[in-house]
């Protein structure tokens, strides 16, 4: 092989912080409890790739008769570096014994960066509502907020499509906010009856709004039957 210049390396710095609080609400509502937390995480990653520069190869008829040195301005079209015309068919070159000058002209190492951040808040309260013959009706209510942000910046060589054998890649940058309100109620229907030691009905609903998509409401019903 002429070269094995194709390594990739990824380095990621990650941090995550969570602060939560839970307890009893007896002073306000007897037998009710609360649970809340705030979370923040950040991922900062560099991805480094070995590249072969396209402007050192493609404009010159793919190793054929073209010559960078024949350009009127004497520099490559994209990077603007002084032209060199490697001796493509020299046995030493084909064996991978490439001079330092040719390597500097043909090869490089480029680094892109991706930063992803996430902030989340959630609060939930639950407790008894009233009594039925079969037991206590329990209710849970909660809210949630999630903010996500990403900024992916490929190396400039990839942004302008100057990596030979690779496709171009643009900057990806954006954010998304998700807000939700949810609730669930558990209703005991039967207890200690023939063929029904316990029958419980659970009902839940969740309203979710995503700023880039819109909002929707989902519902769920479940029946537990213990013989």
For the regions a protein language model found, what residue spans apply to each?
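Surface-exposed, low-complexity loop segments enriched in small/polar and acidic residues
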Residues: 1-179, 192-194
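Glycine- and other small-residue-rich loops at beta-strand/loop junctions that grip anionic moieties
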Residues: 10, 210, 224
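Beta-strand-rich binding-surface signature
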Residues: 138, 180-182, 200-202
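Solvent-exposed loop/turn segments connecting transmembrane beta-strands
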Residues: 175, 208-217
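Feature captures outer-membrane beta-barrel proteins of Gram-negative bacteria and organelles
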Residues: 181-183, 187, 217-226
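Detector for outer-membrane/organellar transmembrane beta-barrel domains
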Residues: 194-200, 222
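Transmembrane beta-strand segments that form the barrel wall of outer-membrane beta-barrel proteins
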Residues: 198-211
């Amino acid at each position: 092989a002429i070269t094995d210049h194709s390594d990739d390396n990824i380095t990621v710095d990650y941090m995550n912080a969570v602060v939560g609080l839970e307890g009893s609400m007896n002073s306000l509502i007897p037998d009710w409890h609360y649970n809340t937390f705030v979370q923040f995480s950040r991922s900062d990653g560099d991805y480094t790739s070995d590249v072969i520069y396209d402007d050192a190869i493609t404009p010159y008829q793919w190793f054929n008769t073209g010559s960078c040195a024949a350009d009127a301005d004497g520099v490559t079209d994209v990077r603007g570096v002084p032209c060199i015309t490697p001796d493509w068919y020299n046995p030493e070159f084909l064996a991978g014994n490439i001079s330092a000058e040719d390597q500097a002209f043909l090869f490089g190492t480029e680094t892109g960066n991706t930063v992803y951040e996430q902030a989340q808040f959630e609060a939930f309260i639950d407790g008894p509502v009233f009594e039925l013959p079969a037991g206590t009706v329990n209710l849970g209510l909660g809210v949630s907020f999630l903010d996500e942000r990403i900024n992916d910046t490929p190396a400039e060589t990839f942004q302008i499509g100057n990596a030979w054998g690779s496709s171009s890649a643009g900057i990806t940058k954006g954010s998304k906010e998700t807000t939700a309100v949810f609730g669930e109620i558990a209703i005991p229907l039967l207890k200690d009856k023939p063929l029904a030691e316990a029958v419980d009905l659970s009902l839940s609903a969740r309203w979710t709004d995503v700023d880039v998509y819109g909002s929707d409401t989902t519902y769920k019903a479940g029946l537990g039957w213990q013989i």
